[in-house]
Amino acid sequence: MTEQRPLTIALVAGETSGDILGAGLIRALKERVPNARFVGVAGPRMQAEGCEAWYEMEELAVMGIVEVLGRLRRLLHIRADLTKRFGELKPDVFVGIDAPDFNITLEGNLKKQGIKTIHYVSPSVWAWRQKRVFKIGRATDLVLAFLPFEKAFYDKYNVPCRFIGHTMADAMPLDPDKNGARDVLGIPYDAHCLALLPGSRGAEVEMLSADFLKTAQLLRQTYPDLEIVVPLVNAKRREQFERIKAAVAPDLSVHLLDGMGREAMVASDAALLASGTAALECMLAKCPMVVGYRMKPFTFWLAKRLVKTDYVSLPNLLAGRELVKELLQEECEPQKLAAALLPLLANGKTSHAMHDTFRELHQQIRCNADEQAAQAVLELAQ
């Protein structure tokens, strides 16, 4: 009599954010099925949870076209090898975590071999290159989506999708401790405080920092006690920001922070930020915000033709209306940015209404995503 094989889940994560999601999923699955086996491409967090790494996650974590081209042969070799080895292993379910350019083709290859496939984290198909939805539909048995409007998009195309809530919404409290964050950053409780977040990429910091600093100078005229906090993701971005500040606003006193973006948001009365995940995090920190963004004119021209949504920031996409002010391209200039931020720093009716809506949206996407994802995997495995 042969011993029954344990539940076997294959996973591929391609970057740190995927490693965090994968570790949370493995943890939730082990609580339900303690003897389950996990194999695939994993980072340190997934490996710490017991995932057997056939390849290290760093192998897939390449950014930019030039870097990808330089590594293309290796990436194609890894994908072909995984197709073969997973095909032989026949896991109960394959979970591709983000990394859509690598994972969706792999999912399609495995599905053809009769393996059930899940794509965890929807690519932004609802915003641009919408035809990708058909490839995703052919390659996967189920998409796990963080946001409710993503599920609505897949439903329109009859692609099975489950809204599981957002892990960031699970990790952040509904009512953040503003005074606690100010203690950490050394900001007086009674001061007005503004967070500047000019982005995590070099091009964004280059394009936005000068206008963000000039905006802060204008606001300081109205609020002389204004404390300005600037969290920067790494030493390179800090150096870049300091260079721009020396040229544009050498006398403006600011608190430069290494990381600590979340603390800066929680501590602040308002934030001026580039779009992206930071806007969602800022919403969850209950910090009223203005989104300012600029890109090269040709890139913007192209984006306007490709992007199919009315808004660029996640709070507005979640609310289905302009909840936070978005000032893009030529609109992203100090006078307009300052005018949009002034009522938020006043901490009056506008701020309180925004705060209340942020809290409602937080509750909508706070669904214990790790548990929901684990449940979806087990249901598909049956």
Curated annotation (Swiss-Prot):
Pfam family, one: LpxB
Entry EC number(s): 2.4.1.182
Top-rank taxon, per record: Bacteria
GO cellular component: membrane
Record keyword Isomerase present: no
GO terms classed as biological process: lipid A biosynthetic process
Single GO MF annotation: phospholipid binding
Keyword terms of this UniProt record: Glycosyltransferase, Lipid A biosynthesis, Lipid biosynthesis, Lipid metabolism, Transferase
Pathway listed: Glycolipid biosynthesis; lipid IV(A) biosynthesis; lipid IV(A) from (3R)-3-hydroxytetradecanoyl-[acyl-carrier-protein] and UDP-N-acetyl-alpha-D-glucosamine: step 5/6
Leading EC class: transferase
Keyword Glycosyltransferase among record annotations: yes
Reaction(s) catalysed by this chain's protein: 2-N,3-O-bis[(3R)-3-hydroxytetradecanoyl]-alpha-D-glucosaminyl 1-phosphate + UDP-2-N,3-O-bis[(3R)-3-hydroxytetradecanoyl]-alpha-D-glucosamine = lipid A disaccharide (E. coli) + UDP + H(+); a lipid X + a UDP-2-N,3-O-bis[(3R)-3-hydroxyacyl]-alpha-D-glucosamine = a lipid A disaccharide + UDP + H(+)
Family classification: Belongs to the LpxB family.
Function: Condensation of UDP-2,3-diacylglucosamine and 2,3-diacylglucosamine-1-phosphate to form lipid A disaccharide, a precursor of lipid A, a phosphorylated glycolipid that anchors the lipopolysaccharide to the outer membrane of the cell.
Name the record gives this protein: Lipid-A-disaccharide synthase
Native species: Escherichia coli O1:K1 / APEC
Taxonomic lineage of the native organism: Bacteria, Pseudomonadati, Pseudomonadota, Gammaproteobacteria, Enterobacterales
